[in-house]
Amino acid sequence: MKVGFISLGCPKNLVDSEVMMGQLVAKGHELTSHPDQADVLVVNTCSFIDPAKKESVDTILEMAEYKKIGRAKKLIVAGCLVERYRGDIRTEMPEVDALIGTNELDSIVDICEGMPPSTNPLEPYLYHDLTPRVLATPRHFAYMKIAEGCDHPCTFCVIPQYRGAFRSRRFESVVSEATRLFQQGIREINLIGQDTTCYGEDLGLKDGLAELLARLAQIETPQEKWIRFLYAYPNKVTQKLLDTLAEHAALAKYIDMPLQHASANVLKRMKRGASGDIFLKLIERIRRTIPGVAIRTSFIVGFPGETAADFDELCAFVEAAKFDNLGVFTYSDEDTSASYALDGKVDGRTIQNRKRRLMAIQRKIARARNRGLVGKEVPVLVSGVSGETDLLWEARMSTQAPEIDGVTLINDFEGSEPRAGEIRRLRITEAHDYDVVGTLLAPTEPAPVLPAGPGLINIESLVAV
């Protein structure tokens, strides 16, 4: 049976798709990148905010057309949209033949084969090191989920409603999977979860993430490796965690820490607490402990009750903090979120104007930071030929996370031609708003051994991501 997959949304959702694809391949089924050639089409959806819901619905309807013109006889919808709108999908989208919630990933084979699913949708699901996975990322890096669910009460967020309570993977399960990935030739592992800094709390571990990172850094590999974690909660960033990042060369000097806002008034309404002053002290401690660290954050503008003064406070905070990377989300008024009932809604035009203003501030900061890198030599992980032009190669510094940060472009090289998956030093020669450009220096390590075989596919072979 040929199955075509479309994975929408965040890396956590992508890992769920990889798990489902892995189970299908383990049972002898074939994956195809051509929806018109698939016997079964699967859309793994996102429903975090309104634009994500719209993209999910549009994609489902697009794939439904392939049931008419192609060979597909079954359309399966999976993921977060199913958890939020299972009943609506069943009644309003007759094109959909089956649904798979976030706790039902193990049912993918049964449903594709027309068998009754054996999975209990009410039992929390979390994959382990023996679960088959087909990697859908480029062959030199992978995402690895270390936890699922969330216990934080953020009023704007609906994730706990369909991902459930926080639960960690077993320590040795994570180590085992990471070891296998590195043995297969993966050069960079990105640890993910709704809140990675809570890792191990439910297992009785104190500073569980720090312990895990230290253990992963000690995995023996034939070549240099990078390990980073994403989605840190600010009040969970302990000194032990910072000391661990500073101690081990394999750990990327990078912290992704969504702060959401800097006004104490807005943060209180978000049920996150803290303030800009508290965050500035934390940022100073991070930079003091880890020289050269890159800090990424994200903010929500237009949250109910956000006044002009609150937004001005956020802008002043960003100018003071000087983040390396920053993302801005416009508030999405989700009908099942606690913030939906709050008063003081901000109009759409004001929200968009605030986003533009905040990004303009960050653009100047990022440009100045990048200019300070010109002339420096840094290690980069080569990604391959640039997607924008085949005249350039693309790479990333360890301070640039995949898919969300800027990139390092290679316009010249010394020695052998760049190869995807190799880590080489690069001399930065140009700086732009979010990207830098440089010359790749001659290699000092053997050519990378990239993973191959039926267990791994490249991201381009997915129908869409």
From Swiss-Prot:
Textual note on the cofactor: Binds 2 [4Fe-4S] clusters. One cluster is coordinated with 3 cysteines and an exchangeable S-adenosyl-L-methionine.
GO biological process, one term: tRNA modification
Stored PROSITE patterns: MTTASE_N (PS51449), MTTASE_RADICAL (PS01278), RADICAL_SAM (PS51918)
Alphabetical list of SMART domains matching this protein: Elp3 (SM00729)
Enzyme class: transferase
Molecular function GO terms recorded: 4 iron, 4 sulfur cluster binding; aspartic acid methylthiotransferase activity; metal ion binding; protein methylthiotransferase activity
Binding residues annotated for [4Fe-4S] cluster 2, in chain numbering: C150, C154, C157
E.C. number: 2.8.4.4
Claim: Iron-sulfur is one of the keywords in the record: yes
Domain of life: Bacteria
Radical SAM core domain location: 136-369
Protein name: Ribosomal protein uS12 methylthiotransferase RimO
Source species of the chain: Solibacter usitatus (strain Ellin6076)
